[in-house]
From Swiss-Prot:
Compartments where located: Secreted; Host cytoplasm; Host endosome
Domain notes: The RxLR-dEER motif is required for the delivery of the effector to the host cell cytoplasm but does not bind phosphatidylinositol monophosphates. The motif is cleaved after the RxLR sequence. The RxLR motif (residues 44 to 47) plays a crucial role in the intracellular processing before secretion. The Glu-rich part localized just after the cleavage site (residues 48 to 59) is required for homodimerization.
Subunit structure: Forms homodimers via the RxLR-dEER motif. Interacts with host E3 ligase CMPG1. Interacts with host DRP2.
Native organism: Phytophthora infestans
GO cellular-component term (any): extracellular region
Location of region: Effector domain: 77-147
Outcome, altering K86E: Does not affect PIP-binding
Protein induction: Expression is induced during host plant infection.
Protein name as catalogued: RxLR effector protein Avr3a
Membrane spanning residue stretches: none
Length: 147
């Protein structure tokens, strides 16, 4: 009898301590005064962008989705290793191009097996392991992962 009372009292105390700790963290997170946030802290490491577009550094080439050739992403039609490798390298180097490819593949119902065959053709030595990022990103695009 005494053990049951001690266990229930312990459970109540733990519940009370947990609930009060959660309320305090909400106050700390939502109640941060604005004067503690420094405006320059978030921008300290960023470089100033130059206004002249010709001299500013380009991180990625200009990309226009309207100019894409539909046959470019057709992995089923790729039979030459050089073409497959070229497309895989382009997809690895340009996120916008990769996103466009994922959308095109999803629209044309390209299966993961076809993507795997394409990647194995692109890198025969590693059996496609070199381009796992493309395969995994396409899986995430399709929503087949736990994220």
């Amino acid at each position: 009898m005494r053990l049951a009372i001690m266990l229930s009292a312990t459970a109540v105390a733990i519940n009370f301590a947990t609930c009060s700790a959660i309320d305090q963290t909400k106050v700390l997170v939502y109640g941060t005064p604005a004067h503690y946030i420094h405006d320059s802290a978030g921008r300290r490491l960023l470089r100033k962008n130059e206004e002249n577009e010709e001299t500013s550094e380009e991180r990625a080439p200009n990309f226009n989705l309207a100019n894409l050739n539909e046959e470019m992403f057709n992995v089923a039609a790729l039979t030459k290793r050089a073409d497959a490798k070229k497309l895989a390298k382009q997809l690895m180097g340009n996120d916008k191009l990769a996103d466009a490819a994922y959308i095109w593949w999803q629209h044309n119902r390209v299966t993961l097996d076809q993507i795997d065959t394409f990647l194995k053709l692109a890198s025969r030595k590693t059996q496609g392991a070199k381009y796992n990022q493309i395969y995994n990103s396409y899986m995430m695009h399709l929503g087949l992962t736990g994220y």
